[in-house]
Amino acid sequence: MERDKQIKTVGVIGHFAEGLDMADGQVVKTRTVRELLRDVCGNENVRFVDTRGWQKHPAALLHKCIELAKFSDALVMLPAHNGVKVFAPLLVFLRKRYGCKAVYSVIGGWLAEFIADKPRLAKKLRSFDAILVESNRVRSLLLEQGFDNVLVAYNYKRLPLLESFELEQPSGEPWPLAVFSRIYEEKGIDDIVWAVREANSRLGRRAFKLDIYGNVLPEYKEHFDVLMAGCDASEVAYKGVAPAGESTSVLNGYLVLAFPTRCPGEGVPGTVVDAYCAGIPVIASRWPSYAEMVEEGETGVTYEFYNRDALLDVLLNPELPKQLLAMKEPCLHKGRDYSYEAGLREFKHLVESGFNAHNQ
């Protein structure tokens, strides 16, 4: 079977949540990959299947995927943890039956650990033409597991990159901090709320103010409501969900983005990309792939994973505001690595190479 044919038509299988105003990382990346492929291949040459709620209609989903495979020179899937166990075998079957290439664009940085004790799933994924991961760390871990089809493609975002003259400078205390992500326990929300309040208490003044943006997950809402009820709104405030595509304008003017994640499966977090594109540095926990994204002292300040006392120490550093204000230009420069334009160049190369991981 010919495997190096030119790629003209592409099918994308993922959680698009069509018709819904959703801004979580999975949906945003899935939609962005579709748009990148449309711009590279032409709108008429890219079709998709939305997997939202597929468990209720598995037969209908299978039929749609078969029709998509008949149309496509390459199928690109973007499932999360549970979905990969279903869609990886499906794409292997469709690849064999219809001759289309199979590509897995991974969301986040969890895949290597997830499949370490799943040899059957790993075998399926090794037969893919390409697996696109967000970091060199994940690529290295997969290479150690015997994969030879892994490429690095960042989590690109379609955002306006601010120019230097557009950057708004915070004027002083209380220094404004922002959280900009889905709101649930593993994002470290409790840690940053505690750290801001504790820092202000120890300093004896309102040195920091925290604004929280994002969709509160249902399982965390009751806890979050209690957490917010115990805060003074002038110190910690929930600002709701920011309009899609307006993250840079919302973040412009903040001193720093707080990213206190407790999730080891982070890859290239979209919220950090948002911050860089707005010229905003980050205070981040050291998730496993952090060093590929956060340059210590250049684009952010990091602290020990899971250690909220270390987060507090960061805030109590009297030089922190001065250090962060000096990072704005490097952050803008770093943001270009994750821009839509950078993504176009990468996906154009991937398509022209036939998603051949061995010719990169």
Please give the residue ranges for each predicted region:
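Donor nucleotide-sugar binding/catalytic pocket of nucleotide-sugar-dependent glycosyltransferases
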Residues: 127-164
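Nucleotide-activated donor-binding/catalytic signature segment of Leloir-type glycosyltransferases, i.e.
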Residues: 222-243
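Short hydrophobic beta-strand element within catalytic cores of glycosyltransferases
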Residues: 258, 277, 281-284, 294
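Acidic donor-binding loop of glycosyltransferase active sites
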Residues: 252-266, 280
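Conserved donor-binding/catalytic core segment of Leloir-type glycosyltransferases
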Residues: 8-13, 168-187, 192-198, 210-211
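A charged, aromatic-enriched C-terminal amphipathic alpha-helix characteristic of glycosyltransferases
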Residues: 322-353
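Conserved acidic donor-binding segment of nucleotide-sugar-dependent glycosyltransferases
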Residues: 296-297, 301-308, 315-322
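Glycosyltransferase donor-sugar binding loop
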Residues: 50, 209-223
